A protein has these predicted regions:
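Short glycine/serine/threonine-rich phosphate/pyrophosphate-binding segments
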Residues: 15-20, 42, 160, 184-188, ...
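Glycine-rich flavin
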Residues: 2-6, 22-29, 34-172, 200, ...
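FAD-site-proximal beta/loop scaffold in flavoenzymes
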Residues: 156-172, 259-334
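Glycine-rich dinucleotide-binding loop and its adjacent helix/turn
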Residues: 48, 143-198, 202, 281-283, ...
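Beta1/beta-strand and adjacent pyrophosphate-binding region of the FAD-binding site
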Residues: 2-14, 172-179
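Hydrophobic "anchor" residues
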Residues: 50, 123, 273, 300, ...
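Flexible, glycine-rich terminal cap/loop adjacent to redox cofactors
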Residues: 9-16, 25-37, 42, 49, ...
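Short hydrophobic core segments
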Residues: 9-11, 115, 133-144, 178-179, ...
Length: 464
């Protein structure tokens, strides 16, 4: 079979890969993209999108139980887990099909199969129909990541699940253990707990959502406990003993080892990059444990080879991958894109209440030597939040006292994942406290709390 030549080959069609392919095509490049599973990658098929569909079902279920608060009468509230999962899978299927349409629209050649790199500038694709040989001056690695599995805690799909199993559960857990309280673990804990599972969350660090500001973590823990979750911090899972229909987890904390019985365990202890079976060692690509080492422009050090998204390391966020994809495509086409500033990438967790943040935590800002001005504003002081029946939460802003630079923003409460982008834009534009204070926020909106938090940092809050 004849070798096919392209300007750019993208390996992996997740949010980093397919966006890179689109942008490269827009810039006049002849582009191919290779995907071994489904267009859209983990995010669209097994991560960001289907989990949000599940969580939306849980949110509606929760609101139906609160109907009386809103002057409504509802009886016979129940859920059909199979139908909930079917809706989630349908959403993923719809969007995956949309990616296929985008590839056709932008004249990107799609190869469904597994890729390897036998030499610089060359890619071999094993498809159902045979082997394809491709060449390109520029190759973008966007192969994503998968769930990390620790020895003794490996998933079996029956009693012990990864996120993939949790996204299409064959049964509703009655007594659930979630190992890890990062975004993935907490979102699944929130989903199953809302539907009625007796849920325990184990976290090895000293607090849940450990990457968040300490005040947000503390507030989240109280909210989760109020919802019926058990939160065990500074605790490790030493061993899982499995038998018919149950798992005995041996948990260790400062007091010693205790044993607890569950019918389901979800392991959410991080992810590892898909770096295997690509031939990276042959090319001399530098690997740091589970990810490819890159510079600020996602260059691997091998001429013409780039790595974006989860395979290139933290933060493991789809929007970071997409932005890197655009940046690399523009670089390949001869442009001069700006490198991404990691501190200006927002993180969002879609538990109840939602959590969102950007920039430094208060502790990190102090460690960096800044003199701070810190503002806080509670949801209970916002009219829209009260009208929505969502008066729990707060917004915290952190400023450099000397320059007025917004160093960080941290939120917990209803719809904060939609609010955080305001502060992201502020950081990108290098706005100061004066710019934010003089901005008119619409009323009545939740966004008014963003303004009030800034005002509070400078002793000017109006509604507390």
């Amino acid at each position: 079979m004849a070798v096919q030549t392209f300007d750019v080959i993208v390996i992996g069609a997740g949010p980093g890969g397919y966006v890179a392919a689109i942008r490269a095509s827009q810039l006049g490049q002849k582009v191919a993209i290779i995907e071994r599973e489904n267009l859209g990658g983990i995010c669209l098929n097994w991560g960001c999108i289907p989990t949000k569909a599940l969580l939306r079902s849980a949110e509606v279920f929760h609101l139906m139980h609160r109907a009386k608060e809103f002057g409504l009468s509802v009886t016979g509230v129940a859920f059909d887990l199979n139908a909930v999962v079917a809706r989630s899978r349908g959403v993923a299927k719809q969007l995956s099909g949309g990616i296929g349409h985008l590839m056709k629209k932008h004249k990107v050649t799609v190869f469904m199969g597994a890729a390897t790199l036998p030499a610089k500038g060359k890619v071999t694709v094993k498809t159902d129909k045979g082997v394809e040989e491709l060449t390109a001056k520029s190759i973008i690695l966007a192969t994503g990541a998968r769930a990390r599995e620790l020895p003794g805690l490996e998933a079996d799909g029956d009693l012990v699940w990864t996120y993939r199993h949790a996204l299409q559960p064959k049964r509703m857990p009655k007594k659930l253990l979630v190992i890890g309280s990062g975004a993935i673990g907490i979102e699944f804990a929130s989903f199953f707990n809302t539907l009625g599972a007796d849920t325990t969350v184990v976290e090895v660090m000293d607090r849940v959502l450990p990457v968040e500001d300490a005040e947000v973590s503390a507030f989240a823990k109280k909210a989760f406990v109020k919802q019926g979750m058990k939160i065990l911090e500074k605790t490790t899972v030493k061993k899982l003993d499995r038998s018919a229909g149950k798992v005995v987890a041996h948990l260790e904390d400062a007091k010693g080892i205790t044993s607890m019985e569950f019918d389901t365990v979800i392991s959410a202890v991080g992810i590892v990059g898909n770096i295997e079976d690509l031939g990276l060692e042959t090319l001399g690509v530098k690997i740091d444990r589970t990810h490819v080492v890159t510079d600020e422009f996602c260059r691997t050090g091998v001429e013409g080879l780039y790595a974006i998204g989860d395979i290139a390391g933290a933060p493991w966020l789809a929007h970071k991958a997409s932005h890197e994809g655009v940046m690399v495509a523009e670089l390949i086409a001869g442009g001069h894109p700006h490198p991404i500033k990691p501190g200006s990438i927002a993180g969002c967790t879609y538990c109840h209440p939602q959590v969102a943040s950007v920039g430094m935590t208060e502790a990190k800002a102090k460690e960096a030597g800044f003199t701070l001005k810190v503002g806080r504003f509670p949801f209970i002081g916002n009219g829209k939040a009260i009208a929505l029946g969502e008066a729990e939460g707060f917004i915290k802003t952190i400023f450099d006292a000397k320059t007025g630079e917004l160093l960080g923003a941290h939120m917990i409460g209803a719809e904060v994942t939609e609010l955080i982008q305001g502060y992201v834009i502020g950081r990108a534009l290098e706005t100061t406290e004066e710019d934010l204070i003089n901005t008119v926020f619409p009323h009545p909106t939740l966004s008014e709390m963003m303004h009030e938090s800034v005002l509070d940092a400078y002793g000017r809050a109006l509604h507390i």
